[in-house]
Amino acid sequence: MLARANINPLTRLATDYLNHYNEVIMLLEMLESCPEFAPDILGWEPRGYDEYFEKSHFKDKDLARVAWEMAEPNSRRELEGMIDHMNAILAATLDALRHNLSPTGCARLGTEASGWLKPLVARAGSVINGEHIMPAAMTDETARQAMVDAVFERGA
């Protein structure tokens, strides 16, 4: 049921949440050639996971909100930390953008901010997809073997 709703059954988290960040990253990347997007960027507001789904058009948003309450605790905690980090970067970016920067300054700000955010969004995606979950007792060798086994199980 969760997998059909694009909610990871292991972590009980949905990657759809990352669209909230991907949209603003796209606008930041376009700021150099389209400075008229600055007001749209300034209109961005942080939204917690639950609030995002409450206001979204995601088909299974109610299921996503219930799954969030039962999410794997370490995954949820790690995702919340990354959300805080991304929100802090965006708060500083929005503050800087409000200072009527030159076109060159706006372009640089957009490039820098999107460059900081993209790896965090990628990492958040790996947390949502459960790619970071491994038993603590695994050695490097057993971890490598587990990864190889997983690849073959998926038919890659």
Give the label of every model feature segment.
Residues 142-156:
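Short acidic DE-rich linear segments
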Residues 1-145:
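Signal-transmission coiled-coils
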